[in-house]
């Protein structure tokens, strides 16, 4: 079957926002106007098309990023609806990795909120062009220009309106298009009847002022336009649109639009902006990767003629078809029934069926082309972040960064019958979600699950009960501490056992140095002259990795350390991989005596919003919890406090804040970084762990 839409007419976009900004409702309206659904589903009624998991419909939040494909103005738009809750950031990250552009949805009463900052930062990291949709213009307190100012103040974004609202709150009735300099007035509730009129007289002056600001801001990104602007020449609408498109695709400019998805206003104009300003797969740089055979960098331009290359970005278990692997095709063509190579794992995989998804319903297709997003049935070994390529043209694409879990809890099956089912359920859930880890405590035999927050683990335990019918008892949440070395040191690990029969002999000298935060463990082989034979080097690294899983102070994993193997010796007969593994672990234990080991704890960026009169209470809360205030700002009658607080001190804070503010205060927290715990706290943690051992 030939390609239905050319690459120029394809858009791969994500819809991202802070929780409750109206993101899923916006996606619903897109599906309604593009003819995908005939009845609009409201999120607050639990009937939304994109929120298809049971818990999503109950909680009214989006958990998994449902992918769907729609058509608008002779273009294909592939949309991924991503969650706005901080506990599900991996869903946002993996979506951004495979998208070409994004729509950031704001609540126009609040503007930029904490999770908006997180997803914005992630989108900037991946170089994703964005347009901004200031939603909920019908809401009490909606303020479009305030929302735009928060984009400048909190995100330092070069964002400018390309529209202005006509009225706000209950009086929100239309939109001024600053490019055409026309007003779009809505005359019915479904938003399908739109009148294009001249701008109402009372809005004309404001529209001219903002059109001028827009032209000036765009001209700064385009030399030719700047010359025309400075010489006072007329800039045509086409020139302005072309310059906005170029600057948006280069991530130098962010157009801001307004509307109310709930009241069906502004969504079609936002879809027009997706087509006008966000890139097609041809507008973005060709994807880069490493050829595993030559270790050279190669590129794959977006073209059907190039060899097939795709990235798997999500695994999902479907009750009817089994394991689904969502993937983005960067180049080439793939037919169902063909074989591909998973270059990340070095395994050959057969593509069973190829499905194009609409939330959770599916259409089977024969072929996918460059620029498409689809799901495959039948892949056994592929996980999130793996590259799938033509067997004759191997390439490993950049994978997806997976944040480390910060919270853990113990789960135990309620009955013997639940025991086996729980193992299978947890394994399937961990396959779908790389930020969810399952481990067994070696000493106690307990199963420990870790994730990105209480809600994250809550949802997963809930899914275990509903989807896999496993009943489990759940322990109290615990903090995922880490350990590290703060001083460089050198240590010897010497292991010798000779008591009849074949002996064991391993001898290594290793230099340990602190690594940058977040860089993890790095191993370097600096052996010269074969004093440790080449075949034993991997055993040394393995021995270190295994012993770093249980740190020296309190048994927490050791992170952010470099190890350089620089000397050692071996025995012709008695040396073995096992002996060198043991020697490496002895070197680590020895190094710990002089490397100033420290315990690290997760620090959360906490944003607390309270009435003015409770500001003093909140400052007290932060100090009492070993936190430090990073900044404050007033918004209406509320105060917004940003602070860094250890996760360990935040358990139960919701109750404290509720009683201090008579239920009017709210807070959001997102993991920010790991930091050394104070000495007194470190001693307590060590004592507690020794007491339990």
From Swiss-Prot:
Give yes or no: UniProt keyword Cytoplasm: yes
Fetch the SMART domains from UniProt.
EFG_C (SM00838), EFG_IV (SM00889)
**Key word Transferase present:** no
A GO biological process this protein is involved in?
A: ribosome disassembly
Gene Ontology CC entries for this record: cytoplasm
Q: Give compartment(s).
A: Cytoplasm
What are the alphabetically sorted keywords of the record? Cytoplasm, Elongation factor, GTP-binding, Nucleotide-binding, Protein biosynthesis
Which InterPro entries does the protein's record reference? EFG_II (IPR041095), EFG_III (IPR009022), EFG_III/V (IPR035647), EFG_IV (IPR047872), EFG_V (IPR035649), EFG_V-like (IPR000640), EFTu-like_2 (IPR004161), G_TR_CS (IPR031157)
Residues annotated to bind GTP = 17-24, 81-85, 135-138
Q: Which Pfam families match?
A: EFG_C (PF00679), EFG_III (PF14492), EFG_IV (PF03764), GTP_EFTU (PF00009), GTP_EFTU_D2 (PF03144)
Primary localisation category: cytoplasm
**Which molecular function GO terms apply here?**
GTP binding; GTPase activity; translation elongation factor activity
**Where does the tr-type G domain start and stop, copy by copy?**
8-282
- Gene3D superfamilies per UniProt: 3.30.230.10, 3.30.70.240, Elongation Factor G (Translational Gtpase), domain 3, P-loop containing nucleotide triphosphate hydrolases, Translation factors
Summarizing the function annotation, the protein's role is:
Catalyzes the GTP-dependent ribosomal translocation step during translation elongation. During this step, the ribosome changes from the pre-translocational (PRE) to the post-translocational (POST) state as the newly formed A-site-bound peptidyl-tRNA and P-site-bound deacylated tRNA move to the P and E sites, respectively. Catalyzes the coordinated movement of the two tRNA molecules, the mRNA and conformational changes in the ribosome.
Q: Which family does it belong to?
A: Belongs to the TRAFAC class translation factor GTPase superfamily. Classic translation factor GTPase family. EF-G/EF-2 subfamily.
Protein's recorded name: Elongation factor G
Organism placement in taxonomy: Bacteria, Bacillati, Bacillota, Bacilli, Lactobacillales
Identify the coding gene: fusA
């Amino acid at each position: 079957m030939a390609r239905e839409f050319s690459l120029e007419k394809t858009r791969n976009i994500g819809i991202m926002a802070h929780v409750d900004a109206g993101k899923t409702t916006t996606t619903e309206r897109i599906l309604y106007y593009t003819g995908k659904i005939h009845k609009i589903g409201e999120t607050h009624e639990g009937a939304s098309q994109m929120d298809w998991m049971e818990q999503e419909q109950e909680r009214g939040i989006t958990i998994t990023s449902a992918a769907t494909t729609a058509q608008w103005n002779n273009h294909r738009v592939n949309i991924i609806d991503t969650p706005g809750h901080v506990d599900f950031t991996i869903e946002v990250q993996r979506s951004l990795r495979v998208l070409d552009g994004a729509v950031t949805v704001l609540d126009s009463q609040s503007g930029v909120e904490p999770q908006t900052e997180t997803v914005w930062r992630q989108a900037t990291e991946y170089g994703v062009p964005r347009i901004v949709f200031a939603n909920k213009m019908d809401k009490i307190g909606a303020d479009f220009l305030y929302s735009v100012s928060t984009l400048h103040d909190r995100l330092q974004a070069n964002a400018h309106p390309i529209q202005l609202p006509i009225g706000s709150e209950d009086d929100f009735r239309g939109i001024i298009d600053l490019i055409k300099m026309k007003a779009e007035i809505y005359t019915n509730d479904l938003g399908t009847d739109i009148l294009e009129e001249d701008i109402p007289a009372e809005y004309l002056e404001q529209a001219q002022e903002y059109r001028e600001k827009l032209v000036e801001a765009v001209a700064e990104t385009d030399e030719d336009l700047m010359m025309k602007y400075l010489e006072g020449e007329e800039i045509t609408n086409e020139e302005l649109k072309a310059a906005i498109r170029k600057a948006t695709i280069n991530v130098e400019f962010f157009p801001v639009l307004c509307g109310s998805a709930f009241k069906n206003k502004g969504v079609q104009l936002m879809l027009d902006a997706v087509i006008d300003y966000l890139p097609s797969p041809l507008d973005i740089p060709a994807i880069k990767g490493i050829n595993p055979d030559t270790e050279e960098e190669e590129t794959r331009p977006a073209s059907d003629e190039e060899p097939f290359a795709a990235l798997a970005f999500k695994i999902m278990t479907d009750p009817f078809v089994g394991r689904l692997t969502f993937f983005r095709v960067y180049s080439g063509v793939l037919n169902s029934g063909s074989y591909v190579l998973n270059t990340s794992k070095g395994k050959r995989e057969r593509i069973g069926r190829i499905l194009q998804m609409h939330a959770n319903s599916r259409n089977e297709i024969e072929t996918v082309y460059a620029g498409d997003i689809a799901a495959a049935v039948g892949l056994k070994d592929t996980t999130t972040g793996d590259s799938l390529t033509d067997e004759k043209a191997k390439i490993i694409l950049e994978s997806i960064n997976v944040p480390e879990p910060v919270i853990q809890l113990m789960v135990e099956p309620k009955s013997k019958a639940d025991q086996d089912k729980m193992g299978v359920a947890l394994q399937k859930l961990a396959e779908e979600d790389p930020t969810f880890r399952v481990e067994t405590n070696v000493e106690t035999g307990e199963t420990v699950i870790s994730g990105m927050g209480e809600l994250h683990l809550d949802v997963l335990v809930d899914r275990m009960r509903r989807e896999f019918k496993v009943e489990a008892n759940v322990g109290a949440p615990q903090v995922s501490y880490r350990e590290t070395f703060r001083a460089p040191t050198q240590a010897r690990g010497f292991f010798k056992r000779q008591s009849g029969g074949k002996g064991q002999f391993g001898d290594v000298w290793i230099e340990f140095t602190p690594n940058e935060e977040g860089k993890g463990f790095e191993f370097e082989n600096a052996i010269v002259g074969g004093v440790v034979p080449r075949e034993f080097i991997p055993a040394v690294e393995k021995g270190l990795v295994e012993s770093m899983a249980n740190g020296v102070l309190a048994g927490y994993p050791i992170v952010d350390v470099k190890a350089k193997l620089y000397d050692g010796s071996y025995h012709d007969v008695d040396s073995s991989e096992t002996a060198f593994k043991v020697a490496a672990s002895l070197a680590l234990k020895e190094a710990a005596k002089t490397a100033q080991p420290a315990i690290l704890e997760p620090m959360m960026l906490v944003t607390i919003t309270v009435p003015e009169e409770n500001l003093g209470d909140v400052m007290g809360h932060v100090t009492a919890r070993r936190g430090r205030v990073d900044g404050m700002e007033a918004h209406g009658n509320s105060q917004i406090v940003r602070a860094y607080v250890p996760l360990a001190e935040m358990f139960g804070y919701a109750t404290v804040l509720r009683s201090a503010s008579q239920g009017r205060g709210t807070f959001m927290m997102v993991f920010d970084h790991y930091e050394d715990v104070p000495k007194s706290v470190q001693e307590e943690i060590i004592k507690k762990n020794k007491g339990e051992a």
